[in-house]
Design a protein with these regions (language model features):
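Hydrophobic, membrane-embedded alpha-helices of multi-pass small-molecule transporters
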Residues: 5-25, 40-48, 73-77, 81, ...
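Membrane helical hairpin/interfacial module
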Residues: 18, 22-104, 110-111
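Membrane-water interface regions at transmembrane-helix termini and the short interhelical loops
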Residues: 27-31, 61, 87-93, 109-131, ...
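Hydrophobic alpha-helical segments and their helix-loop junctions in multi-pass secondary transporters
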Residues: 78-89, 117, 133-159, 217-218, ...
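Helix-loop-helix connectors at the membrane interface of multi-pass transporters/channels
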Residues: 85-100, 188-209, 267-289
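Membrane-interface loop-to-helix entry segments
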Residues: 103, 116-146, 306-321
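Membrane-interface interhelical connector segments
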Residues: 220-249
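Extracellular/periplasmic helix-loop-helix junctions in multi-pass membrane proteins
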Residues: 280-281, 294-313
Length: 334
């Protein structure tokens, strides 16, 4: 197999780090512009289907996989309809039925996703392709609407003013990660089994995120007790505010959780799939981790300290996974 270059690792990081902001902006535009944003969503679904078709055909060529594009496209039509329906149902439920957005997402998005995942784990991985054209369209619409507002600080300000919706984007992050995995499959750099393992992890992490939001928003436990119960860093308790009608979360929490997910995914693909040597993977991960930590430290020193600790855990777990994979491969060769 070819090696993953530094640029490709950076692209994996960029996709995961950037997509939540694009989706957040697209949601804001959907509320402000209505029908135009709805048409853009439908267009994004068809663009995503074209991307999926090309990815499946390329995977056939590179991995000699007996893929069935027609089956994948049919499944993607269904998943596209589910996510688009969930977006509109969220708006209608909040307007007419007084239902919170998380209930609409849980009923119309999470339930069929879990069913499809348990029925055939590989089906759920292709849901994330829809997020790629959404990211492009969100930024293009924002730039055409008001070029002066296109700045990172305005995005951060909007995220803090709409913290509840921004926290709900954390449920989408695992699916965005699967989009990065699909890109690796497209390049022929990882075995399908590796991608399906990551897909299953993303599914379960999404379920636990939803469960965690319910527990924290109920206010039964305190912030620190809830964090311990969910095996989350105590630093998350500092930024959660219990007791308000809305569950408010600072933007920095999503930052370092997302980046940690990127690093673990990149390291897992590098070491477990055997696409690069162990030393080369270690150098790339350490370089990216330190660079990202420096950026986070500029904005928030407490988050930087916790993030540095999380990097150590991620690198250690990834290295152990790589060593176990190498030992198993050695036993099979003997």
């Amino acid at each position: 197999m070819n090696k993953l270059s530094s640029f490709e690792l950076f692209w994996l990081m960029f996709m995961l780090y950037d997509s939540p902001y694009a989706l957040m902006l697209l949601h804001y535009l959907a509320q402000a512009q209505g029908l135009l944003a709805a048409e853009m969503l439908i267009l994004a679904a068809f663009l995503g289907q074209a991307v999926l078709y090309m990815a499946v055909k390329r995977a056939e060529q590179n991995l000699q996989v007996n893929a069935k594009p027609n089956l994948f496209l049919k499944m993607y039509f269904y998943l596209s309809a589910v996510i688009i329906t969930a977006i509109f149902a969220e708006m209608l439920a909040a307007e007419f039925l007084n239902l919170t957005p998380k209930w609409a997402i849980a009923l119309l998005f999470l339930v069929p996703s879990v069913y499809l995942a348990f029925k055939n784990m590989r089906n759920i991985a292709y849901l994330s392709v829809l997020l790629l054209p959404l990211s492009l369209i969100g930024y293009v619409m924002l730039f055409l609407g008001n070029a002066e507002s296109f700045s990172l600080m305005n995005v951060l300000s909007f995220a803090q003013d709409n913290a509840r919706f921004f926290f709900s984007l954390a449920h989408i992050l695992p699916f965005v990660m699967q989009g990065a995995v699909l890109m690796v499959l497209y390049r022929g750099l990882a075995a399908p089994e590796c991608a399906f393992k990551v897909s299953s992890w993303a599914l379960w992490s999404n379920i636990f995120l939803l469960l965690g939001e319910y527990i924290l928003s109920c206010g039964v436990f305190g912030a620190e007790e809830s964090a311990r119960l969910l095996f989350l860093p105590i630093e998350l308790a500092r930024i959660l505010r219990i007791g308000d009608a809305l569950l408010r979360v600072e933007v920095f929490s999503v930052w370092h959780w997302t980046i940690a997910g990127v690093l673990s995914t990149a390291l897992f693909l590098d070491l477990a799939a055997g696409s690069v040597e162990k030393e080369a993977a270690r150098r790339k991960i350490i370089f990216l981790a330190l660079a990202l930590w420096l950026v986070v430290a500029i904005f928030d020193d407490v988050t930087a300290v916790n993030f540095l600790f999380e990097i150590g855990i991620v690198v250690s777990v990834g290295a152990m996974a790589g060593l176990i994979k190498q030992k198993r491969s050695g036993r099979r060769e003997k």
